[in-house]
Amino acid sequence: MEVGIAHYLTVSAVLFTLGIFGIFLNRKNVIIILMSIELILLAVNLNFIAFSAVLGDLVGQVFALFVLTVAAAEAAIGLAILVVFFRNRGSIAVEDINMMKG
């Protein structure tokens, strides 16, 4: 049995769907929302790499590396903001974040 593009697209669709459900079903915990965004970005990267391998073009793989770099920076900055917010407010609930000034 050969692993084709359909298998990669199926796994990518499942990851993307899990990420979307994670965002919509859990609106109270910011950390789970960030992890769901990372799942969505992982699904997009899997699509880029799968199509890059099938088409024989390296542009998709290079773009996936850029997306991974931006996702890592986004996760680091998001978690740093959450740590500072937790130290100031004592909670990371989404309802408390809506009450921020600025």
UniProtKB/Swiss-Prot annotation:
Transmembrane segments: 5-25, 31-51, 66-86
Tree of life domain: Bacteria
Keyword Lipoprotein: no
Record-listed E.C. numbers: 7.1.1.-
Pfam families: Oxidored_q2
GO cellular component: NADH dehydrogenase complex; plasma membrane
Keyword Cell cycle tagged: no
Bilayer topology term: Multi-pass membrane protein
Any GO BP: ATP synthesis coupled electron transport
Catalytic activity: a quinone + NADH + 5 H(+)(in) = a quinol + NAD(+) + 4 H(+)(out)
InterPro entries referenced in this protein's UniProt entry, alphabetically: NADH_UbQ_OxRdtase_chain4L/K, NUOK/Mnh_C1-like
Compartments, record wording: Cell inner membrane
A GO MF label: quinone binding
Annotated family: Belongs to the complex I subunit 4L family.
Function comment: NDH-1 shuttles electrons from NADH, via FMN and iron-sulfur (Fe-S) centers, to quinones in the respiratory chain. The immediate electron acceptor for the enzyme in this species is believed to be ubiquinone. Couples the redox reaction to proton translocation (for every two electrons transferred, four hydrogen ions are translocated across the cytoplasmic membrane), and thus conserves the redox energy in a proton gradient.
Designated name of the protein: NADH-quinone oxidoreductase subunit K
Organism, scientific name: Chelativorans sp. (strain BNC1)
